Amino acid sequence: MGDWMTVTDPVLCTENKNLSQYTSETKMSPSSLYSQQVLCSATPLSKNVHGVFSAFCTGENIEQSISYLDQELTTFGFPSLYEESKSKEAKRELSIVALLNCMNELLVLQRKNLLAQESVETQNLKLGSDMDHLQSCYAKLKEQLEASRREMISLQERDRQLQCKNRNLHQLLKNEKEEVQKLQNIIASRATQYNHDVKRKEREYNKLKERLHQLVMNKKDKNIAMDVLNYVGRVDGKRGSWRTDKTEARNEDEMYKILLNDYEYRQKQILLENAELKKVLQQMKKEMISLLSPQKKKPRERAEDSTGTVVISDVEDDAGELSRDGVWSLSCDTVREQLTNSIRKQWRILKSHVEKLDNQASKVHSEGFHEEDVISRQDHEQETEKLELEIERCKEMIKAQQQLLQQQLATACDDDTTSLLRDCYLLEEKERLKEEWSLFKEQKKNFERERRSFTEAAIRLGLERKAFEEERASWVKQQFLNMTTFDHQNSENVKLFSAFSGSSDPDNLIVHPRPRQKKPHSVANGVPACTSKLAKSLPTSPSDFCPSRSCVSEHSPVSALTVTPEETKPNEVGRESTDQKWSVVSRPSSREGCYGGCSSAYTSSHVERDDLP
């Protein structure tokens, strides 16, 4: 048969074109529609039809073409194009009706196929678009999942760090509360001891006052007298002057002048001594304030070693000077001078010891709460033994001074002076005593005024200390936020910082701390307000200063005392609660009650009283 090509009808071509445009114009892409239109309109209709018919059917092969079409249609299940003949020999004729019916069926099938093809193409386009959309959604969700995982890991790490910081802060708060409780107990014990000392001093003062009144104010009992028999004359042979009223009056005037001069001289000495003691006390106050001030230098090991050697040498010097044999032969001035020197040296010892402990505590805080440096057991025992020896010597020196004063009072009053003093009850003496009493009251008022101003200054320092603590807390919180090691975006960082600090401006995160002349540093903080109480309540004699340190040697082999100033808060007018950090590093064999006894005895010299005389 040869190669045959499909015969296309021009009418069918136009119908197919219209049908395809009708069914798939909205579903197909513009490029496909354009290409279809170009293919359909590329050649004129007459030329196309002529070329197709010239290729498939010609005037010579009409019968063959019809028979071929009939065979093809019958194979596809269509009825035959020829009419059935009654006789076999008769020639079959072409049935126009069958041909038209077949053509109609073919057109219907073609339309159905085109519709199905269009629906399939539309469905494929929908599925393709859905697939692209799902793939894009899948990529976006995958990226979001990775970002959320990274953010979750960073938040978990941040949460862990915050929990660790919170635990550390809770532990610090607990330690601070314990220190506050200990310091309150120490203050109470000091107050009771101060009250007892004041009562004892008042009793001694009353006794001395009564003794002076008996010696000076009482009249002479004229009924009791003694006459001298067998009077021995003078060596030169002269007679003694008769005792007349004039001579007795002149002698009494001379006696009163001598007494007045003696009293004035004693008053000057007492004023000078008070001035010296005030200078010493003021110096001790300044040193205590500078010691517990917020401006703490960095700890220096060499300086600590040098101060330690100075402390040992001072203790040895005190031990050499205040010997037991030399105290009995010393005068009051020498004893007073040595007392002043010993108090100064003891204060230097206390200052160096507190500075050493303070430097150790600051070093521990700066190194991130590492193991605390503890004084060795042997050094502690040696220091406590030296302190005990010094305390004993001071006690003996005080006893010797009291005995010397009593001896002077006893020897000053002989028979002649007592007989003369009993007759010197005069109005001028009363007026002089009244003047002295008024002077004493003025001094008392001045002292009360100074104490009030000192208390107000301490309260102001406490308020400033509180404000500084608030600023320091905000600064520490912002420093903690700046220490995070996660690299978020800038907007996220701003949001996080604004959530914690209440401001999204990065400039607000920088805190400039105030000068540290008034307020101390923290996690180990200074105590500027408590210095007023410490300095105001410092002991004025070795009997008040030394016994406070006598109990340090008890249980000394098993404990070491560490003092670090921490914090003060004003409670009432004239009273403040001092917060100092007292920590005891005990060895495994130490007793539980060692710390309480040592700390209470060590701080028993610090007392406070509002109703001073």
Curated annotation (Swiss-Prot):
Pfam families: ADIP. Residues 126-227, 266-293, 375-461 form a coiled coil. It is found in: Cell junction, Adherens junction; Nucleus; Cytoplasm, Cytoskeleton, Microtubule organizing center, Centrosome, Centriolar satellite; Cytoplasm, Cytoskeleton, Cilium basal body. GO terms for molecular function: protein domain specific binding; protein-macromolecule adaptor activity. The modification Phosphoserine is found at residues 290, 293, 313, 537, 541, 543. InterPro entries: Adhesion_Centrosome_assoc, Afadin/alpha-actinin-bd. It comes from the Eukaryota. GO terms for biological process: actin cytoskeleton organization; cell adhesion; centrosome cycle; cilium assembly; intraciliary transport involved in cilium assembly; regulation of cell motility; regulation of Rac protein signal transduction. GO terms for cellular component: adherens junction; cell leading edge; centriolar satellite; ciliary basal body; cytoplasm; nucleus; protein-containing complex. Keywords: Cell adhesion, Cell junction, Cell projection, Cilium biogenesis/degradation, Coiled coil, Cytoplasm, Cytoskeleton, Nucleus, Phosphoprotein. Residues 566-579 have a biased composition (Basic and acidic residues). Residues 361-381, 507-527, 565-595 are annotated as: Disordered. Interacts with SSX2 and SSX3. Does not interact with SSX1 and SSX4. Interacts with VAV2. Interacts with afadin and alpha-actinin. Interacts with WRAP73. Belongs to the ADIP family. PANTHER family: AFADIN- AND ALPHA-ACTININ-BINDING PROTEIN (PTHR46507:SF1). Acts as a centrosome maturation factor, probably by maintaining the integrity of the pericentriolar material and proper microtubule nucleation at mitotic spindle poles. The function seems to implicate at least in part WRAP73; the SSX2IP:WRAP73 complex is proposed to act as regulator of spindle anchoring at the mitotic centrosome. Involved in cell movement: localizes at the leading edge of moving cells in response to PDGF and is required for the formation of the leading edge and the promotion of cell movement, possibly via activation of Rac signaling. This is Afadin- and alpha-actinin-binding protein. The lineage of its organism: Eukaryota, Metazoa, Chordata, Craniata, Vertebrata.
